[in-house]
Amino acid sequence: MPPKIDINRVEELMPVITRRMITPSRLRFNMASDDALNLLASFFAAQVKSRCQKVEFDENTTENIAKLADFITAAVPKFGIMLCGRCGNGKTTLMRAFQQCVNWLDARHHFEFLDDKEYGYRYKPNMKIVDVREIVQSAHDFDRFKELRAYPLLGIDDLGKEPAEVMNYGNLLSPVVELIEHRYTNQLFTFITTNLTAKEIGNKYGTRIADRFNEMLHVIIFKDTTYRH
């Protein structure tokens, strides 16, 4: 007789088992999507203004911010975001606006609902943004690399412009791939901007990382518009 799984028994045991597992809280905003849209738009405008540029909420910009707002207010969001598109269309500006928005909400204790009081766990949404080349450079400083890969919220700007592999004392390393694998395994929130297409990501990092991205990242594709003058 072939083996058979007792579904009723599995459903009975699963809650007992999962209570003993500490699953990381996933970053989300505890508010309506429209409220998140207005909040993110305000921080986006502030970022643009800080660079002495004119703030324009055209259709593309509004749509991109709205998609981010929808994602970050979902009941069970993925544990990351990827903004894809050509240079100069606002990807980095939106990522920095998101970082400032998270910091502003955290200062007002917005994320206390993500604390796990049973285990005494406090959710700390500290977000750091690094240029992807800084990750490659950290391959020569393992303590720095460990710090980056374990950061609670990490923004990686301009993924794809770095060499896929680097040499360190005769060893061939893939620091970006290793960092992403670690963050995927530990469900750490990762925010990425890139000029690469999905196909180019697969070609550069391999199908394994492309598959990881599909599971961990909500992707927002920016249309071919540039705001740099």
What name fits each language-model region?
Residues 100-103:
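Walker A/P-loop NTP-binding motif
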Residues 114-185:
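Conserved nucleotide-sensing/catalytic segment adjacent to the nucleotide-binding pocket
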Residues 83:
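Hydrophobic anchor at the beta1->P-loop junction of P-loop NTPases
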Residues 94, 98:
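Hydrophobic positions on the alpha1 helix immediately C-terminal to the Walker A/P-loop
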Residues 88-91:
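Conserved glycine(s) of the Walker
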Residues 1-77, 220, 229:
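A short, basic N-terminal segment
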Residues 80:
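Walker A (P-loop) ATP-phosphate-binding motif of ABC ATPase nucleotide-binding domains
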